[in-house]
Curated annotation (Swiss-Prot):
Gene3D superfamilies: 3.30.2460.20. Palmitoleoylation is required for efficient binding to frizzled receptors. Depalmitoleoylation leads to Wnt signaling pathway inhibition. InterPro entries: Wnt (IPR005817), Wnt7 (IPR013300), Wnt_C (IPR043158), Wnt_CS (IPR018161). A lipid is attached at S206 (O-palmitoleoyl serine). One of its GO terms (cellular component) is Schaffer collateral - CA1 synapse. It comes from Mus musculus (Mouse). GO terms for biological process: angiogenesis; animal organ morphogenesis; apoptotic process; asymmetric protein localization involved in cell fate determination; canonical Wnt signaling pathway; cartilage condensation; cartilage development; cell proliferation in forebrain. Residues 238-266 are annotated as: Disordered linker. Residues 1-31 form the signal peptide. Male mice lacking Wnt7a fail to undergo regression of the Mullerian duct as a result of the absence of the receptor for Mullerian-inhibiting substance. In males, mature sperm fills the vas deferens, but sperm exit is blocked due to the persistence of the Mullerian duct, causing male sterility. Wnt7a deficient females are infertile because of abnormal development of the oviduct and uterus, both of which are Mullerian duct derivatives. This is Protein Wnt-7a. The intrinsically disordered linker region is required for recognition by RECK in brain endothelial cells. It comes from the Eukaryota.
Length: 349
């Protein structure tokens, strides 16, 4: 582990008041005043604080899963006006967009998937109490397919169930945005479940495959990022439906006249159109594109014309000098030339 990574983990544990101990390949977590510490973590709902106090080891994993989701979000949108950033108060799930847009839909889905992925992985690795390998995928023989369960299958049902209880608990209000958030949370988890992998190993004499054992594994999170980015591009505009006047919304339907069709379980849904993300706006949570690096010649979203929203861009020139064309001379010294290069960088005004 790099020094920077160790420092980041240290800050995380200290901020939560948690001592992380690794004993014999397993991890145990000792909370130092969990009640006090959990009450200081910003943005937690009462149910989430209760889970934090009872399962501080799981809170560390939840934080790692949330960060994994945010990192993937930033990767997928690194070349767009919106780069997975937002204004507002920081929570355990990062800063949140205030409008119910496509971007908010993606954020909720990728974080929900990240938390479920991290919990499931921690169970498989033996780093969490009360969970482990999937007990239902052990020893059963699938005669038609010629293999049986073996190894340690990832218990995705436990991971999704635990993540659902924690992540969904922040949705306290009963309004259209809550319905949207809960739908996108579920979509992220369901897409994770649908992309689980089956790995197998052959057993037999001289490389034959007389018997085969198989187990389920988690997909690479980057794969989920690409799947969810496609879902973002095809996100469905929805609106709330109320059972009667003056009642809270009960479900979401696709926003089309004379239609009550509900979105698919794995659709990302949004209730408001996206802002253009050109300017900083506390109302929407947009941080704007001022100061963002752009590509002068690119025609797509990362190009300066689109990224800078017509405001123009600044040009920064840099000189890089290094030793090059080095040769060894007998005996015994090395002679190098000095090479230099001028580069330009462009940032939005």
């Amino acid at each position: 582990m790099t020094r920077k990574a160790r420092r980041c983990l240290g800050h995380l544990f200290l901020s939560l008041g948690i001592v992380y101990l690794r004993i014999g390949g397993f991890s145990s977590v000792v909370a130092l005043g969990a009640s006090i510490i959990c009450n200081k973590i910003p943005g937690l709902a009462p149910r989430q604080r209760a889970i934090c106090q009872s399962r501080p080891d799981a809170i560390i994993v939840i934080g790692e899963g949330s960060q994994m989701g945010l990192d993937e979000c930033q990767f997928q949108f690194r070349n767009g006006r919106w780069n997975c950033s937002a204004l507002g108060e920081r929570t355990v799930f990062g800063k949140e967009l205030k409008v119910g847009s496509r971007e908010a839909a993606f954020t909720y889905a990728i974080i929900a998937a990240g938390v479920a992925h991290a919990i499931t992985a921690a169970c498989t690795q033996g780093n969490l109490s009360d969970c482990g390998c999937d007990k239902e995928k052990q020893g059963q023989y699938h005669r038609d397919e010629g293999w049986k369960w073996g190894g340690c299958s990832a218990d995705i049902r436990y991971g999704i169930g635990f993540a659902k209880v924690f992540v969904d608990a922040r949705e306290i209000k009963q309004n259209a945005r809550t319905l949207m958030n809960l739908h996108n949370n579920e979509a992220g988890r369901k897409i994770l479940e649908e992309n689980m992998k089956l790995e197998c190993k052959c057993h037999g004499v001289s490389g034959s495959c007389t018997t085969k054992t198989c187990w389920t594994t988690l997909p690479q999170f980057r794969e989920l990022g690409y799947v969810l980015k496609d879902k973002y591009n095809e996100a469905v505009h929805v609106e709330p439906v109320r059972a009667s006047r003056n009642k809270r919304p009960t479900f979401l339907k696709i926003k089309k006249p004379l239609s009550y069709r509900k979105p698919m379980d794995t659709d990302l849904v949004y209730i408001e159109k996206s802002p253009n993300y050109c300017e900083e706006d506390p109302v929407t949570g947009s941080v704007g594109t001022q100061g963002r690096a752009c590509n002068k010649t690119a025609p797509q979203a990362s190009g300066c014309d689109l990224m800078c929203c017509g405001r123009g861009y600044n040009t920064h020139q840099y000189a890089r000098v290094w030793q090059c064309n080095c040769k060894f001379h007998w005996c015994c010294y090395v002679k190098c030339n000095t090479c230099s290069e001028r580069t330009e960088m462009y940032t939005c005004k």
